[in-house]
Amino acid sequence: TPNAASWTAREYGAHWFALDPPRHLVVYTPESMRILADEHGFRVEEVTFDSQPEEIIFSEQYRRDIPYNAPNSYANTGENGPFAVEELREFNRKTRELNAAGNAGNMCLVLRRGHGD
């Protein structure tokens, strides 16, 4: 699920790829997911951050006013698209850094029944 507390959410704001409806109508933070889980009798057992470079790629593309399905979109052109090879390398590096730091835009949560009391 998208992580609204992430670096990508803060950096890209309204251009953040995860805000692109209808894929995600609600976005959470790790804390809001813990609260929601607790309210419904679950506990968060594990949180993993597993963003892919495309999150930054498409967020940056939106910032540059290039729609997802535009002819020059990365979605249609891949490495021959709107970004230099050096930019794509940096997006990959930044994604690895954010995942390792727990500050990435995508999180995977494992929930278990019970509060663990």
Model-identified regions with their sequence ranges:
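A C-terminal cap/extension of S-adenosyl-L-methionine-dependent methyltransferases
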Residues: T48-D117
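Conserved acidic-Pro-Pro-aromatic motif
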Residues: Y12, V27, R43, D50-S51, ...
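Short, glycine-/aromatic-enriched active-site segment of Class I SAM-dependent methyltransferases
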Residues: P2-V26, E31-D38, E60-Y62
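Alpha/beta-hydrolase-fold catalytic nucleophile elbow
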Residues: T1-P2, D50
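Secondary-structure transition into beta-strands, especially the periplasmic turns and strand N-termini
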Residues: D38-E45
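Short loop segments at secondary-structure junctions
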Residues: E31, G41, R113-D117
